[in-house]
Amino acid sequence: MIIYCAADRNYFDLYFDLWEKQTSKIYPELKRHIALHNPTDEQKQKCYDHLIDFNDITEWFPENPTKNHFYLLRWLYLPYLYQQNILETQINCLPVKEMNLPNKLDVEQWRIQRPKRGYLGGVSAAIFTPKSAEKVVNHAKTMIDNPPLSDHPMNCLLYTSPSPRDMWT
């Protein structure tokens, strides 16, 4: 399994150190990958220093992206070519304790949610099969010219399992 997230340069500066520390502490055996929009040389070097694979996906965006384009950021480069399941997180959603992650999925996307004020919060993380990740990437590419108003359309793209977990912040 691969742990994956995506970030623009601002979110990278705010959250990368925490994401890197927690993912290496909780899941040291998992390969880590990050998609970056407009990264600095220093940010690329941080990835190298922490043995985190990265892709610069700036070229996939229009010259002057809007806020709505960034709703697609984490969906445009799910690394399905590794042919491993992908634990996709937001860079600001951190694992706080180990969870028994499924090795074999019987659904396309296994969503991880947490309680928030008595209700289930948004999707904190999800596990994708390589096949479902490819579907999501291809769909996100079709939306870049007309980006969504939120990331909700992408969260609803696949059949998902109800799996609330109180293991992510």
Where are these regions (language model features)?
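A basic- and aromatic-enriched beta-loop-alpha substructure that forms the phosphate/nucleotide-
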Residues: 62-68
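Conserved small/polar residues in nucleotide/adenosyl-binding loops
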Residues: 159-164, 168
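Soluble or luminal CAZymes and related metallo-dependent hydrolases
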Residues: 11-15, 70-74, 152-157
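Short His-Asn-centered micro-motif
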Residues: 4-9, 35-38, 73, 89-91, ...
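Short catalytic/ligand-binding loop motif for oxyanion handling, primarily in non-cytosolic enzymes
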Residues: 42-43, 95-98, 119-122
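Conserved catalytic core of nucleotide-sugar-dependent glycosyltransferases
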Residues: 101-157
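N-terminal anchoring/stem segment of glycosyltransferases
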Residues: 1-62
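GT-A fold catalytic core of metal-dependent nucleotide-sugar glycosyltransferases
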Residues: 70-111
